[in-house]
Amino acid sequence: MGRKLNRIKAALADKDKTNKWLAEQLGKDSATISKWCTNASQPSLETLLLIAKILNMEVNDLVRLEAVND
């Protein structure tokens, strides 16, 4: 079993972009972007696809599957 975690924070750093910049691009609150970047919450699949498009990346580069050890 695993849980999906996003790599939005790393992707923004790679592109030299900020949470505020992404919030403006998406029309979202910067607090929402912050929650996504810390994986406190996750964007919808539709939003994740839009983020990938905005950052000119593949959506696969924004998602990782991390195993949970019991």
Go through the PLM ranges and name each one.
Residues 12, 23, 52:
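The alpha-helix within a helix-turn-helix
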Residues 46-61:
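DNA major-groove recognition helix of helix-turn-helix/homeodomain DNA-binding modules
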Residues 37, 55, 63-66:
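DNA major-groove recognition helix of helix-turn-helix
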Residues 17, 43-46:
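Residue-level signal for the short linker/turn that defines the boundary of a DNA-recognition helix
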